[in-house]
Amino acid sequence: MEDATFNNQDKLPISSDDLVKLLNDCEIEFDLYSHKPLYTVKESKIFYESQYENNELNCHIKNLYLRDKKKNNYLFVFDQDKIIDLKQLNHLISATRLSFGSPQRLFENLGVFPGAVSPFCMLNGKKNGVKLFFDTSFKKTK
């Protein structure tokens, strides 16, 4: 299935093909799911309910690319149903004025376009100083 990221493989810091090769080279088992860009949790739920019987994936996430007043970049990974309060998140990480990063910064720092953000983006994000935060509720997930 083609999407914006697929059509721009040559512009990505690490292409999806290179990511698959890296996982295979590291002997990391994985299942590959291809889908159109999903911009909202609602879109994600509709897509997965229509594609996969019994909702076979046991952990559904939402990824938020945020930036603060000091121009620090963050990738937050939450359970898809968790309600996020950006003001509270500011206090939790001692940031000021968290807001969503622009599509241009998203591509520059994580190497993807909106609708294609995942924790794997940190392969690009780490070298660009993006800080990664996982919600602790994932400890309960397989």
Label each PLM-derived region with a short phrase:
Residues 1-142:
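Extended, low-hydrophobicity, polar/charged segments
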